[in-house]
């Protein structure tokens, strides 16, 4: 077992006694990105793993892209051919003492939270990257570590890709089940008719189509209010678009604003209400509310939907999920701009009027089926997380020398 010493750097920990450490600016050259000015076929990258457009300018590969800002800045990318990067990512070239692929693997395990700028959006400065300490084995050992990790990670990545694919298949299965049941019902084979609505297709011949607004009351939430109008106003918690998803309502701390007594009566969420997102990327998303310890209200990015009589709110929730996932909301809201699924648009959504008892049967059936599929998805996601953590821990062990390699195992 090799002798180890404390590196003096928190994220690195112990390193072999023959290794040293060095600041990144002595090992690599870090360059800013910029917006391209010409058209062409060169892929353009930001902080994400995929190019999002092409241009005429280029930088030569190989290079490593590291994030400047954004939720994925902690995920480095190795680019082997010509590329261009915009200002949400830095590109890195190696100096003579450092192997670029070894830097790529080090960047997987940097302590980003220690170096991040304290802003709303996660961000890293060029100076922070340049002043970061790196473990410095011999160039030969860097090659060996990078080559070993290439071989190991390619196998792990294959498992990760297969697991992600299985999760997507389960999600597709869930949507297929929802679509089939909310449009065809659960009472076996029966004559069908064309609904004349692209998003719905065929429905049972004896079942009419109506509009949501004829069967449900819809209340749009309150505009933001940053100050009380008089002494009767109180500061209350409210749901906003970020709180409402098909998976349910978020349990985190809620934002607050001022409500009058009349507004509290109008906008208070009740057990069993359907909350629907009015605007933004999640437009059309919805969830059924449950009782809370304290009253919670709605802001105007949310609508409360309640049955006028016999129509089932749980059935409507599944119908809306079906339509959202099939792209209906994108079309009626013109996704080219910021989508707004307004109260009028929700009221005009096609509503398949199954009998009261069949709506209940559909909701019960989908609750059971979706819960089973969701459990499988959760299990696969847990496995995915375990494998990702295993991969990261292996990378860390190798790049910091805690796990050794034979230096005869060299990269090409």
Where are these regions (language model features)?
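Non-catalytic DNA-recognition/assembly elements of restriction-modification systems
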Residues: 2-46, 139, 143, 194-223, ...
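A short beta-sheet element
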Residues: 46-110, 117-120, 124-130, 240-241, ...
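Sequence-specific dsDNA recognition surfaces
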Residues: 6-9, 22-61, 75-80, 84-87, ...
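Hydrophobic pocket-lining residues within nucleotide cofactor-binding pockets
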Residues: 129, 182, 244, 249, ...
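Amphipathic alpha-helical coiled-coil/heptad-repeat segments
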Residues: 1-12, 136-190, 352-412
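A short glycine-rich beta-alpha junction/loop motif
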Residues: 4-7, 83-89, 120-143, 295-303, ...
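Short coil/turn segments at secondary-structure boundaries
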Residues: 37-42, 118-121, 190-195, 225-233, ...
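Periplasmic-binding protein-like
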Residues: 325-329
